[in-house]
């Protein structure tokens, strides 16, 4: 959890927002996936949001569902994902690493064992996409026992009660949804979120990162101008992977220029 605090303090000093890319671990295969993650970090990513392949990712649009399918086709298992996470942490000791999960994967070996394994490999946060705040007690309690930040989603239509709960239970960062629905670069997020961000700050919530539909540098600078601590981009990055499956080096080159431009926009 301290890695998030350190990151946001440093970015604050530099008057920058965070740019956080999302990819699915093991897409399109373990070796290339590790190269992709190194490229994201080397190109300026401030933190990572990583998915573990899951057969039925409800909150995700077709782009990220396809990433899951590619990782499955490559035979990637949750155990291998944890091995990858250990390698990433060893190579990049300071970057915050967040997991985006579904509850079934957490339940598989028992909730406590899951968070213990996260702690062991150096994961900083876990967002369980299909567990609402009111059902989150066993997850967030296990997370905190193992020094893992429980991450909560703040939807654009959140009422005051939900904002208070998210602020009270969340650590690390708050995942601020640009809009309702499934993830995807084609569904551009454009709701006025500054009022939600102000409320979250008033209730001392963890810093808000805006996600869902973030696919251009302009959207990153708009999120930061609205008061968010930064932005998360997933589908736009996964599309670059999908488009360049036949040319791995081209894939890394395109990821490099995309992430550099998105990060540059967080300084605007």
Curated annotation (Swiss-Prot):
GO molecular function: tryptophan synthase activity
Amino-acid biosynthesis keyword on record: yes
Reaction(s) this enzyme catalyzes, per UniProt: (1S,2R)-1-C-(indol-3-yl)glycerol 3-phosphate + L-serine = D-glyceraldehyde 3-phosphate + L-tryptophan + H2O
EC number: 4.2.1.20
Active-site residues, as the UniProt record annotates them: 49, 60
GO cellular component annotations of the record: cytosol
Positions of transmembrane segments: none
Top-level EC class as recorded in UniProt: lyase
Keywords of this entry: Amino-acid biosynthesis, Aromatic amino acid biosynthesis, Lyase, Tryptophan biosynthesis
PANTHER family: TRYPTOPHAN SYNTHASE ALPHA CHAIN, CHLOROPLASTIC (PTHR43406:SF1), TRYPTOPHAN SYNTHASE, ALPHA CHAIN (PTHR43406)
Family statement drawn from the similarity comment of this UniProt entry: Belongs to the TrpA family.
Biological function: The alpha subunit is responsible for the aldol cleavage of indoleglycerol phosphate to indole and glyceraldehyde 3-phosphate.
Matching HAMAP family: Trp_synth_alpha
Designated name of the protein: Tryptophan synthase alpha chain
Species in which this protein is naturally found: Salmonella paratyphi C (strain RKS4594)
Gene: trpA
């Amino acid at each position: 959890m301290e890695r998030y605090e350190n990151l946001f303090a440093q970015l604050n000093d530099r008057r920058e927002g965070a740019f956080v890319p999302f990819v699915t671990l093991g897409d399109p295969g373990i070796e290339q996936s590790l190269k992709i993650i190194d490229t994201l970090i080397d190109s300026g990513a401030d933190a990572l949001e990583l998915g573990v392949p899951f057969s039925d990712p409800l909150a995700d649009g077709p782009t990220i569902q396809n990433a899951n399918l590619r990782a499955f086709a490559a035979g990637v298992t949750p155990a291998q994902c944890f091995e990858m996470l250990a390698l990433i942490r060893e190579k990049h000791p300071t970057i915050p690493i967040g997991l985006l999960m579904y509850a079934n994967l957490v339940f598989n070996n028992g909730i406590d064992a899951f968070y213990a394994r996260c702690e062991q490999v150096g994961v900083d946060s876990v967002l369980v996409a299909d567990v609402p705040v009111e059902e989150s007690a066993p997850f967030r309690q296990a997370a905190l026992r193992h020094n893992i930040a429980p991450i909560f989603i703040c939807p654009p239509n959140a009422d005051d009660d939900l904002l208070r709960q998210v602020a009270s239970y969340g650590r690390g960062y708050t995942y601020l949804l640009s809009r309702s629905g499934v993830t995807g670069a084609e569904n551009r997020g454009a709701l006025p979120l500054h009022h939600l961000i102000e409320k979250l700050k008033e209730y001392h919530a963890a810093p808000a990162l805006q996600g869902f539909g973030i696919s251009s540098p302009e959207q990153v600078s708009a999120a930061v101008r609205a008061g968010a601590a930064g932005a998360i981009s997933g589908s736009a990055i996964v599309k670059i992977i999908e488009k360049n499956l036949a040319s791995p080096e081209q894939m890394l080159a395109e990821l490099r220029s995309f992430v550099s431009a998105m990060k540059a926009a967080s300084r605007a």
